Amino acid sequence: MKPENKLPVLDLISAEMKTVVNTLQPDLPPWPATGTIAEQRQYYTLERRFWNVGAPEMATRAYRVPTKYGQVKTRIFYPQPDRPATLFYLHGGGFILGNLDTHDRIMRLLASYSQCTVIGIDYTLSPEARFPQAIEEIVAACCYFHQQAEDYQINMSRIGFAGDSAGAMLALASALWLRDKQIDCGKVAGVLLWYGLYGLRDSVTRRLLGGVWDGLTQQDLQMYEEAYLSNDADRESPYYCLFNNDLTREVPPCFIAGAEFDPLLDDSRLLYQTLAAHQQPCEFKLYPGTLHAFLHYSRMMKTADEALRDGAQFFTAQL
């Protein structure tokens, strides 16, 4: 697709999305486009600080949990003494960026709105970790907390997975992994998926959308994939191309959120249509005027706050 044939996205987004796009952080250096991945991770963490300000205060604890790959950092958010369920959160960032700090506000709001314990898992990033290491770390953390639930004062009889972007893929992949391998970590009551990628290699939205404003050009998406996967055969794995998994049975209830001007939107639409066609419990909601990654901007965007509330409400309705 010639770039000039794409939609003029920045002219079409909502007023509040434009405010976010035009928000300058004067102390921020330029994005290190030609820098190392370590420099890009450092920049991403620095840039997200502004957007994480003002999140709800609550009891928070940091723990390292064992996996076969080594210890993985986790952060537990306790919004209240009662513990109706535990929700595991997987951050986005194209598998190569992001951490518990970059998504701290998202997790705090999700805990506040659901009144459930939220556990963020700081899975090892790519390319240092290759598929399926991140999923195996997430599953290992889930199993660990299931076995040690009383020690951490959490309710692991009912759990959920949630994530944005690449984290959404990891959330659903982890739930399917537990189902397929018959691993008991408690009942998976729901999965919350904000603008994820689920295995499409091409689509209308991938052609019409994506640019420097969202880091989701065709070249960007290829780079993330090459960093994450171990080999070409992994592209067809049912835990990477989730459409190659069995989506006709025992899929936990899924809340699927789409951003209107996201090149990955068709992934969400196809996931919803597939699940709905096979009577799997699911809900799809499109957030008008939004770009990919809008969930970060709840400090300025009512729509981002609404999307988090919608996901929390969906999850608690399953309990």
From Swiss-Prot:
GO molecular function, one term: carboxylic ester hydrolase activity
Enzyme Commission code(s) on record: 3.1.1.-
UniProt xrefs under SUPFAM superfamilies: alpha/beta-Hydrolases
InterPro entries found in the cross-reference section: AB_hydrolase_3, AB_hydrolase_fold, Acetyl_esterase, GDXG_lipolytic_enzyme, Lipase_GDXG_HIS_AS, Lipase_GDXG_put_SER_AS
Function (record text): Displays esterase activity towards short chain fatty esters (acyl chain length of up to 8 carbons). Able to hydrolyze triacetylglycerol (triacetin) and tributyrylglycerol (tributyrin), but not trioleylglycerol (triolein) or cholesterol oleate. Negatively regulates MalT activity by antagonizing maltotriose binding. Inhibits MelA galactosidase activity.
HAMAP family associated with the record: Acetyl_esterase
Identification of the protein by name: Acetyl esterase
Organism: Escherichia coli O6:H1 (strain CFT073 / ATCC 700928 / UPEC)
